[in-house]
Amino acid sequence: MDEPMNDAPGAQVKVTFTTNEADLQLPEEKRQLLVPADIRRYGLSRILNSDLMLDSGSIPFDFLVNGSFLRSSLEDYLNSEGLSLETNLTLQYVRSLIPPVFEASFEHDDWVSSVDALTATSPAGRWSGENFSRGQERILSASYDGLLRIWNASGEVLVTAPSASHGGHSASIKAAKFISSTQIASTGMDRSVRVWKYTDPGASGQAELKPTLELYGHRASVDSLEVHGPSKRILTASADGSVALWSASKSSSPEADASLLPNAHTSKRRKVASSVTTPQRGPLFLMQIHNAPATAAVFDPRDHTVGYSVSQDHTVKTLDLTTGSVVANLTLSHSLLSLCAIPRPNGAPLLAVGTSARHITLVDPRASAATTSVMTLRGHTNKVVALAANPENEYSLVSGSHDGTCRIWDLRSVRPASGGESEGGVGGNVSEPVYVFERESRQGKKKSVAGEGAKVFGVVWDRELGILSGGEDKKVQVNRGRDVVRE
């Protein structure tokens, strides 16, 4: 090992700049440079942005050294690694993720289980095409009080869903998504999937949320919901261990099993309790595929005929949604509680799976993959129940946990796992969060390691509105940072 370097006036370090970003490549002759030993990230970023280098203006950069972000001066880094002044450091420069700051929170009457965004760049906004207009950005929240609410970006409630007596859910809502700018799907503890027609405020200023379809097939709480707008397909996961595919269209939905309808075992008096009659239908497929509660199911980002599901039975399953069958099965070491698919340039996505063991496992679902677990993300202190991919790149995501925090992860920053850190405890890579933000409602209050009173239940990352999260504090919280998702 080289001798640690000594403090020396004017000491310099030879660095080699490299990047994987095609539009930010330096000419070969500019990649090696002598820089001051006491320089930090900001100084290195200024060098790269200078006229003699990239001439890129004011792009903030971070720098990776051996897979970890540089968080000190080069001098301090070399000393910490026991390296000498003569060491040639390779610095990989990447666009910075700017820390998201608290912007607003929207108060509810009960816990907020789920949140979604409707903007020009959100999935539902893109699927809506010309039917969506800028200035109509909306936030959808689902609550344990059994109600959906739609908000504008200023935090005003535009409309609240009807209660059970008027066609709404009869128990807590667990998940909700925009299918388009005019259609919403929701699921809940009442075992139902519901489709709603949303009418945005027009000249009258009156918004409307009207139930149009009730879907029955699950035999327990429906805890997860994913939608694909162009095909009007809905994918759900239930505590009964099943995963189901549905249509948001009445005409293409089969009849429901009569024994599963809410009126099947109730008295005549109870049957007429609702003043609204909504069509009731069943699933296109219902797959009884897990041996414990199914906690999440998602569509493949590039192929809606492929799905993925996870469960407390420790398994990740790849689903053929044209036949309703399982085509691949992976078994991990812990109960799996949340799931998101991170698109990759080619082939299958990377699956991020939140666990009861407080970490996130990145999984390659391809049967041909040499290693099932690609990376382990560590930092949460309680179970990880919500995940959302960055909408603008393929290397970052946000997680929500019962520890009361959301954490942002940058998959470009990795290190080899030490004993017991990776999924399965053997080999692999590990990453730590680059940013952590807590519930604003808990600021100034004594913090609980377990996150009591501040558990996060749902999170979504939108390019325009920022990171939206909901939780036990009965609030939707908005965190946004300038260029936080800049590609």
UniProtKB/Swiss-Prot annotation:
<feature type="repeat" description="WD 1">
    <location>
        <begin position="122"/>
        <end position="161"/>
    </location>
</feature>
<keyword id="KW-0698">rRNA processing</keyword>
<comment type="function">
    <text>Component of the NOP7 complex, which is required for maturation of the 25S and 5.8S ribosomal RNAs and formation of the 60S ribosome.</text>
</comment>
<feature type="repeat" description="WD 3">
    <location>
        <begin position="217"/>
        <end position="256"/>
    </location>
</feature>
<dbReference type="InterPro" id="IPR015943">
    <property type="entry name" value="WD40/YVTN_repeat-like_dom_sf"/>
</dbReference>
<comment type="subunit">
    <text>Component of the NOP7 complex, composed of ERB1, NOP7 and YTM1. The complex is held together by ERB1, which interacts with NOP7 via its N-terminal domain and with YTM1 via a high-affinity interaction between the seven-bladed beta-propeller domains of the 2 proteins. The NOP7 complex associates with the 66S pre-ribosome. Interacts (via UBL domain) with MDN1 (via VWFA/MIDAS domain).</text>
</comment>
<keyword id="KW-0539">Nucleus</keyword>
<feature type="repeat" description="WD 2">
    <location>
        <begin position="168"/>
        <end position="206"/>
    </location>
</feature>
<dbReference type="GO" id="GO:0043021">
    <property type="term" value="F:ribonucleoprotein complex binding"/>
</dbReference>
<dbReference type="Pfam" id="PF08154">
    <property type="entry name" value="NLE"/>
</dbReference>
<feature type="repeat" description="WD 4">
    <location>
        <begin position="379"/>
        <end position="419"/>
    </location>
</feature>
<dbReference type="InterPro" id="IPR028599">
    <property type="entry name" value="WDR12/Ytm1"/>
</dbReference>
<comment type="similarity">
    <text>Belongs to the WD repeat WDR12/YTM1 family.</text>
</comment>
<dbReference type="InterPro" id="IPR012972">
    <property type="entry name" value="NLE"/>
</dbReference>
<dbReference type="GO" id="GO:0030687">
    <property type="term" value="C:preribosome, large subunit precursor"/>
</dbReference>
<dbReference type="InterPro" id="IPR001680">
    <property type="entry name" value="WD40_rpt"/>
</dbReference>
<protein>
    <recommendedName>
        <fullName>Ribosome biogenesis protein YTM1</fullName>
    </recommendedName>
</protein>
<dbReference type="GO" id="GO:0000466">
    <property type="term" value="P:maturation of 5.8S rRNA from tricistronic rRNA transcript (SSU-rRNA, 5.8S rRNA, LSU-rRNA)"/>
</dbReference>
<keyword id="KW-0690">Ribosome biogenesis</keyword>
<feature type="region of interest" description="Ubiquitin-like (UBL) domain">
    <location>
        <begin position="13"/>
        <end position="95"/>
    </location>
</feature>
<keyword id="KW-0677">Repeat</keyword>
<feature type="region of interest" description="Disordered">
    <location>
        <begin position="253"/>
        <end position="277"/>
    </location>
</feature>
<dbReference type="InterPro" id="IPR020472">
    <property type="entry name" value="G-protein_beta_WD-40_rep"/>
</dbReference>
<dbReference type="InterPro" id="IPR036322">
    <property type="entry name" value="WD40_repeat_dom_sf"/>
</dbReference>
<dbReference type="InterPro" id="IPR019775">
    <property type="entry name" value="WD40_repeat_CS"/>
</dbReference>
<dbReference type="GO" id="GO:0000463">
    <property type="term" value="P:maturation of LSU-rRNA from tricistronic rRNA transcript (SSU-rRNA, 5.8S rRNA, LSU-rRNA)"/>
</dbReference>
<feature type="repeat" description="WD 5">
    <location>
        <begin position="451"/>
        <end position="487"/>
    </location>
</feature>
<dbReference type="GO" id="GO:0070545">
    <property type="term" value="C:PeBoW complex"/>
</dbReference>
<dbReference type="GO" id="GO:0005654">
    <property type="term" value="C:nucleoplasm"/>
</dbReference>
<keyword id="KW-0853">WD repeat</keyword>
<dbReference type="Pfam" id="PF00400">
    <property type="entry name" value="WD40"/>
</dbReference>
